[in-house]
C-alpha cells in the first residue's frame, strides 16, 4: 500500500471514473491511471500532506441499526437522478432511498425501494448527495443512529465513513 494525500477527493474520484477498467500505478509523487488494454492514461499528482486535514485517530463505527447492500447500478441511478432534479439531499427511510431537497416541501424527488435489514421501520437518515462521490462499485452499508455510516466496497479494499445530517432520526 502507498500512503498519499489528495487535496480534492471528488476530483480524484471523477478522474478515476473516466476509465471503465482503471488500473492505478502508484509512484513517489503521483499515481498513473491507465485503461486496461488501451494507451489512455492520466497522471494525477499527490497533494502536499501539510495542506490536507487528516483524522487524528481511527474512526470506530458504533453499533448500526440499519444495513443494506447498495449495488453499483443503484448508486449510479440515485446520484444521476439527484443531478437531474437538482436534489442536494438523500434520505434513507423505511426501506427506501429518496433524493430531494429537504428544505423545499414541493421539491421534485426520486425514490426507490431497497432490501434493508433493520429492527425498526421508523427511521429517517439524511445524507448530503455531495458526500456520496464514491469509487464505482457495490457497497455494504451500515448506518448508525449516532449519525455516521460506513460504506464498504463489496469487491475492493475501499471504505468510507460518511456523516449523516443532524436531522437524522431513528425510532422517532
Which residues does each predicted region cover?
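DNA polymerase processivity clamps
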Residues: 1-45, 61-172
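Short, well-ordered, aromatic-rich surface patches in folded extracellular/luminal domains
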Residues: 45-54, 58
Amino acid at each position: 500500500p502507498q500512503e498519499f494525500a489528495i487535496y480534492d477527493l471528488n476530483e480524484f474520484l471523477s478522474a478515476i471514473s473516466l476509465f471503465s477498467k482503471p488500473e492505478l500505478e502508484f509512484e513517489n509523487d503521483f499515481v498513473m491511471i491507465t485503461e486496461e488494454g488501451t494507451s489512455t492514461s492520466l497522471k494525477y499528482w499527490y497533494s502536499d500532506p501539510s495542506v490536507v486535514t487528516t483524522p487524528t485517530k481511527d474512526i470506530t463505527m458504533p453499533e448500526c441499526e440499519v444495513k443494506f447492500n447498495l449495488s453499483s447500478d443503484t448508486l449510479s441511478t440515485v446520484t444521476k437522478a439527484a443531478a437531474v432534479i437538482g436534489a442536494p439531499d438523500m434520505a434513507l427511510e423505511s426501506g427506501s432511498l429518496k433524493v430531494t431537497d429537504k428544505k423545499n416541501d414541493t421539491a421534485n424527488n426520486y425514490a426507490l425501494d431497497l432490501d434493508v435489514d433493520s429492527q425498526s421501520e421508523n427511521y429517517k437518515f439524511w445524507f448530503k448527495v455531495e458526500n456520496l462521490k464514491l469509487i464505482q462499485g457495490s457497497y455494504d452499508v451500515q448506518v448508525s443512529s449516532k449519525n455516521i455510516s460506513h460504506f464498504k466496497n463489496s469487491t475492493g479494499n475501499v471504505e468510507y465513513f460518511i456523516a449523516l445530517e443532524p436531522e437524522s432520526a431513528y425510532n422517532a
